[in-house]
Amino acid sequence: NVTRELKHLIDTLHQNQMECVMEMYFEQEENQNLILDALRYWATEFRVDGFHLIGENVPITAIAQDLYLRRSKIFYQYIPEQLWKEKEHYPHLFVYNDEYLYTGRKLLNHQGGSLFEFGNQQKKQNKTVGFVNFMANNNGFTLADLFSYCEKHNEANGEENTDGSNYNFSINCGTEGKTSRKYVKELRRKHLYMALSMVFFAQGVPLLLAGDEALNSQQGNNNAYCQDNKIGWVNWKRNTGMEALQEF
């Protein structure tokens, strides 16, 4: 029974002090009451710990104030101004968007970055809601690929490399993809360490993509959701430099 297996999986995660946050996409024309009902169902029936919501018509104000969802972590790209102005705090509500990602990448990779904007991103925090900061997430390059590829390489997805974002602000440090050149590998290492330092020294909540701590690569694919193979899998094997990165 699929339902029973999923519930068992989530319970097992909880027993091991891990949480399950679902990424859910809703179409523009989706009924807002249906969205609320769906979130309540997953929160109460499956006991998921939160939701990363994607879509332009998500009723985020109603979700933030819903009694059934007050214990669920809610991640969304935009928080309405009226919530910012309320005296009530929303400790379960988090701003999740690409502002930090683009600001950090532009500055680190010398692609038109702004120290002023980076400073604002580093110190942004609010008593009403939280902020999530990241340089890589599940919808783009891995952290290792961010400094190994100037261009996306999504040919294996079967869409002639037209899928996935073209705005990556990535850098290959001198060679596209894998290399044995020591100076290129050292430059990539420095960039990666600086990226992690930026995220973890910021005041917001740091997010680290699974596998980035092991230098996982998707071979330059920045839209690998359809790759149920070595491209899309997280490689937990010992990579050169992995132990040094984790020690860092």
Show the residue positions of the predicted features.
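Acidic/aromatic-lined carbohydrate-recognition and catalytic surfaces
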Residues: N1-L36, R40-Q82
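The substrate-binding groove and active-site-proximal loops of carbohydrate-active enzymes
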Residues: N1-T3, F26-N33, R47-E56, L107, ...
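Acidic/Ser/Thr/Pro-rich low-complexity tail/linker regions in eukaryotic proteins
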Residues: F169-S170, G232, A244
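Conserved alpha/beta catalytic core and glycan-binding cleft of carbohydrate-active enzymes
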Residues: R47, P59-A210, A214-L215, N223-Y225
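Aromatic- and acidic-residue-enriched segments that line the glycan-binding/catalytic groove
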Residues: N1, F26-N33, K87-L93, G220-K230
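Compositionally biased, low-complexity linear motifs
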Residues: K152-N157, N221-G241
